[in-house]
Amino acid sequence: MCHQWLVLSWFSLVLLASPLMAIWELEKDVYVVELDWYPDAPGEMVVLTCNTPEEEGITWTSAQSNEVLGSGKTLTIQVKEFGDAGWYTCHKGGEVLSHSHLLLHKKEDGIWSTDILKDQKESKNKTFLKCEAKNYSGRFTCWWLTAISTDLKFSVKSSRGSSDPRGVTCGAATLSAERVSVDDREYKKYTVECQEGSACPAAEESLPIEIVVDAVHKLKYENYTSGFFIRDIIKPDPPKNLQLKPLKNSRQVEVSWEYPETWSTPHSYFSLTFSIQVQGKNKKERKDRLFMDETSATVTCHKDGQIRVQARDRYYSSSWSEWASVSCS
């Protein structure tokens, strides 16, 4: 949130907020007005200033009304509800001089609204953003869910502490083809790829990465934040190249696998541990899992069963990979 008066030079559009400083610039010509949301709330007074050195012949209109709202270089409006938000335009002699788009950020009982994204409910605290990294390269993926289909826009920014010179760059949020069902309702999934510019995979992390998602739906603005260390969001790809070797005169087989290609190297330093599980024919019959650091194991595998292997960082209890499997047949 802005902590000083927002004053642009005479050739640009200027918005001045009330002393509560409840207005700030999201992007060029787009401003967020922060409102306490309760019955009979007074709202916020906003002053719009046109981008012309002239003082006469200026009129104001809004997208909500074609009527002239006022005249002169400035227009003062009281913003109390969504009907007061949207586009405001100043004109002179039929010429458009500048635009301003006002969005509202609601606060009810001291809590900012979180209506746009779906709470993924994976902890005691609300979880709107989830992030994963396949290795320690500094590259990670974040995603979120929403039931909204239209008039929706996201922007993402990230950093690793204000005092850390290493920047984090995020691409544009994209709509995934995957649809996620939660409580019998289908949600759309958005993802974003981020990369820490000067990541050092072997270095100890002292500052968390912070990610902020700005979400806009129609005239509503919300933001969502998450903070984490890369080590906490590590989830390797599944082991690759699973192979079975029958053992002579035995019902046992030797199953072997390799580290996933995307895992950090050298493997002698970035080591994985593995979990092995044998499934029966109906896939519901499962024997106890075996845990080991080697890339092979001897197990009993019956016809029509399968062997599953997954991986996790050996030295830090982050997430297990998805399973890789091979048929016993």
Curated annotation (Swiss-Prot):
PROSITE patterns per UniProt: FN3, HEMATOPO_REC_L_F3, IG_LIKE
PANTHER family, per database record: INTERLEUKIN-12 SUBUNIT BETA (PTHR48485:SF4), INTERLEUKIN-12 SUBUNIT BETA-RELATED (PTHR48485)
Transmembrane segments: none
InterPro entries: FN3_dom, FN3_sf, Hematopoietin_rcpt_L_F3_CS, Ig-like_dom, Ig-like_dom_sf, Ig-like_fold, Ig_sub2, IL-12
Subunit structure as annotated in this protein's UniProt entry: Heterodimer with IL12A; disulfide-linked. The heterodimer is known as interleukin IL-12. Heterodimer with IL23A; disulfide-linked. The heterodimer is known as interleukin IL-23. Also secreted as a monomer. Interacts with NBR1; this interaction promotes IL-12 secretion.
Top-rank taxon: Eukaryota
Pfam families tied to this protein: IL12p40_C (PF10420)
Disulphide-bridged cysteine pairs: C50-C90
Signal peptide: 1-22
Residue ranges annotated for the Fibronectin type-III domain, each copy included: 238-329
UniProt-listed GO biological process terms: interleukin-12-mediated signaling pathway
Keyword DNA damage in record: no
UniProt keywords, alphabetically: Cytokine, Disulfide bond, Glycoprotein, Immunoglobulin domain, Secreted, Signal
Keyword Signal attributed: yes
Residue intervals of the Ig-like C2-type domain: 29-106
Gene Ontology molecular functions: cytokine activity; cytokine receptor activity; interleukin-12 alpha subunit binding; interleukin-12 receptor binding
Name listed for the protein in its UniProt record: Interleukin-12 subunit beta
Annotated SUPFAM superfamilies: Fibronectin type III, Immunoglobulin
Family: Belongs to the IL-12B family.
Annotated localization: Secreted
Main location group: secreted
General function of this protein: Cytokine that can act as a growth factor for activated T and NK cells, enhance the lytic activity of NK/lymphokine-activated killer cells, and stimulate the production of IFN-gamma by resting PBMC.
SMART domains (alphabetical): IGc2
GO CC terms, sorted: interleukin-12 complex; membrane
Gene responsible for this protein: IL12B
Positions annotated with a glycan in the UniProt record: N125, N135, N223
